[in-house]
Amino acid sequence: MLSRAMKNLLTQLRQQGIEDERLLAAISAVPRERFVDEALAHKAYENTALPIGYGQTISQPYIVARMTELLQLTPDAKILEIGTGSGYQTAILAHLVKHVFSVERIKGLQWQAKRRLKQLDLHNVSTRHGDGWQGWPSRGLFDAIIVTAAPPYIPQELMLQLTDGGVMVLPVGEHTQILKSVKRHGNGFHSEVIEAVRFVPLVQGELA
């Protein structure tokens, strides 16, 4: 049975235009309070971003839902996530697709996320400590790629790891950021601007 807080969040998401019932069911199946510090658990179902340590955040549920919806996921999809973070977005993806590959440059976050996903019996996820700018080429190509931190421009290395017809959703920009959807058509790519967003930067090269 869903808590009142979860029901209120789902109502808010619907009011903000999230209509995919399969996605909403996945969100309702993931206890967000398990992905934040115990001291912030009372805020877990507020539609807001929360700190998770290491200067990183767990994105607000609307952005998680919006980006996931834009990926147009099918149950047999193989997806790459850049920026595992708390593992919350990863868990929602795991309820929606066949397999999730997730890269995180901060070892402490990767370890915590891996433990949480295991506790929730989500075993269709592979995580890796690595540079998100490089993706995970040995496991590609991917039907979808989601990037949960903002590069100043769209990384070509990630675009090349999309299947033909694959979709990548990511925030782009340094000071002000725009959410973009990029679709691959053969050797060409079509980019579409979605909305203004705010994310932590996608740090290149340096692992932590």
From Swiss-Prot:
Gene3D superfamilies in the record: Vaccinia Virus protein VP39
Active site: 59
Alphabetically ordered keywords of this record: Cytoplasm, Methyltransferase, S-adenosyl-L-methionine, Transferase
CDD domains, per the entry: AdoMet_MTases (cd02440)
Enzyme Commission code(s) on record: 2.1.1.77
Biological process terms in GO annotation: methylation; protein modification process; protein repair
Catalytic activity as recorded in UniProt: [protein]-L-isoaspartate + S-adenosyl-L-methionine = [protein]-L-isoaspartate alpha-methyl ester + S-adenosyl-L-homocysteine
Gene Ontology MF term list: protein-L-isoaspartate (D-aspartate) O-methyltransferase activity
UniProt cross-references to HAMAP family, sorted A to Z: PIMT (MF_00090)
Protein name from the UniProt record: Protein-L-isoaspartate O-methyltransferase
